[in-house]
Amino acid sequence: MAGAPGPEIREKFQAALALSRVELHKNPEKEPYKSKYGARALLEEVRALLGPAPEDDDERAADDGPVDQALGAGEPRDAEGPGAQRALRLAVVEFHLGVNHIDTEELSAGEEHLVRCLSLLRPYRLSLGCVSLFIQAQNNLGILWSEREEIETARTYLESSEALYNQYMKEIGSPPLDPTEHFLPEEEKLTEQERSKRFEKVYTHNLYYLAQVYQHMEMFEKAAHYCHSTLKRQLEHNAYHPMEWAINAATLSQFYINKLCFMEARHCLSAANVIFGQTGKITATEDTPEVEGDMPELYHQRKGEIARCWIKYCLTLMQNAQLSMQDNIGELDLDKQSELRALRRKELDEEESVRKRAVQFGTGELRDAISAVEEKVRYLRPLDFEEARELFLLGQHYVYEAKEFFQIDGYVTDHIEVVQDHSALFKVLAFFEADMERRCKMHKRRIAMLEPLIVDLNPQYYQLVNRQIQFEIAHAYYDMMDLKVAIADKLREPDSHTVKKINSLNQSALKYYQLFLDSLRDPNKVFPEHIGEDVLRPAMLAKFRVARLYGKIITADPKKELENLATSLEHYKFIVDYCETHPEAAQEIEVELELSKEMVSLLPTKMERFRAKMALT
């Protein structure tokens, strides 16, 4: 290998690197890129001092495209001799010029420099002195094309980097030179250990960018795999920012939650808690330049975001259990519960083998700390009230934690979503509760937390959220009324207080369903002839429940009862008529449509009998 460049070149190059690292906010306000432009001028001086690129490489530069830069393009050779060494150093300079132009938002110029870097390196890409720089240049081009929304091109560059890393490790394996070493004297070269650390960091970045590209392409399985690998490697090489690592692990948990892989989701969230606890406690490094303790706002925001991921974990696990155990009217099916209890024994027997197949974060003390968090949280579906309550309390703990940051003043949408999740936790817990009075109290808690939101919200700006809450409050009152009716049915003769309570709940449910339906009307207060796909099912359910509610009003006045039956029939008829003219609606409410048809058939006869009875009296 040829000797190091002269002192002038080395000094200018090191000065350029130092200027490149100056943070933008440390530049004059009117010249935010002053240090970047200074670094660029020095890099251009270094390039001039190194001399022109070898001719054969220059000629190839114009024809190179991302696909041609795949590994199969020409056999690699060692970077020996003065010409090869000059090409290497020029490539390092071109790389830094490329990054410099991208940092100053001159993307096309940045791309040109990076492509020139690859052209100079291509013949030597698998050599000890080139492989790291070649991968870094391709990674940066991958990011650049990703920002241009050219995701396929970005993917080509990044997958090429991954393949080159794998080929190098398989065929050579020894730690390659870091690009900066081409401008260092022999006595200042890096140790093998430091080279390995830096090369592995480059590859970790490659996996991280691939995860983002696959996510963008909706290749979610692949994205999750690469994200998991990235997080695992960051811990192994101690190259991570605790706050950023924790939020990425918590975000990954959402993928596993949606896949109903609760053991993996729990592991990600437990690891997120442990690593987030390191915030502000680790020594700042090149990888973690910011001292996180100086960012209280961001700290509390990230803490709230991780808490919201935990809420989703608890809620989804409970809801999945409910779906597995409910009958066709949404009540607990004891036979299904017994079947799941039998399955539980099998799940516990297989727990260890499932755990071994799952990717685990950390080793030694870190692994123990993560396991300690995991052991306090169940990952199997709750099968009874006590198990469900355990998850509910954990979810509620994180609701309070999330609300500390996501307050109504400043974070309206986030705050409302957290409250809706809290309500949903009570709703699913009520499914596991056998005592009907206690179930009523749970629905009452839901209403108490949701009704104030309606008062604070401007329906003009928050129409969608407003509708969601109106519908949910209506449903809570509806469920409470059903429970009170079921309790009353067990009495010989319900007293006037019980009747009054049932009618009051009925009226409240009607009020909120009507508010929801009225929100669908046009500015002239006319109900739409065609209901939008996004609100079709809730609108049809609201109509069905309004019809049922009118039929459930308890009154001693025959005339009033006849009016209620007529209103009930009107709403049932609307559902039947709408589904006849809009067949797509029938698929959304098959059960309710069949019941509506029955009521449209039965109610007129019932009303006639009622009129005849009234005439006789």
Swiss-Prot record:
Q: Which Pfam families match?
A: KBP_C (PF12309)
Q: Give compartment(s).
A: Cytoplasm, Cytoskeleton
**Highest taxon, organism lineage:** Eukaryota
Phosphoserine occurs at S174
> Signal peptide: which range, if any?
none
What one GO molecular function would you report for this record? Answer: kinesin binding
Any one biological process term the GO annotation gives: central nervous system projection neuron axonogenesis
Q: Which InterPro entries match?
A: KBP, TPR-like_helical_dom_sf
| The entry's keywords | Cytoplasm, Cytoskeleton, Developmental protein, Differentiation, Neurogenesis, Phosphoprotein
Region Disordered: start-end pairs: 48-83
Q: Where primarily located?
A: cytoplasm
GO-annotated cellular components: cytoskeleton; mitochondrion
In terms of Gene3D superfamilies, this protein maps to: Tetratricopeptide repeat domain
Its biological purpose is as follows: Activator of KIF1B plus-end-directed microtubule motor activity. Required for organization of axonal microtubules, and axonal outgrowth and maintenance during peripheral and central nervous system development.
Q: How does it assemble?
A: Interacts with KIF1B; positively regulates KIF1B microtubule motor activity. Interacts with STMN2.
Please report which protein family the annotation says this sequence is part of: Belongs to the KIF-binding protein family.
Q: What is this protein called?
A: KIF-binding protein
Q: Which gene encodes it?
A: Kifbp
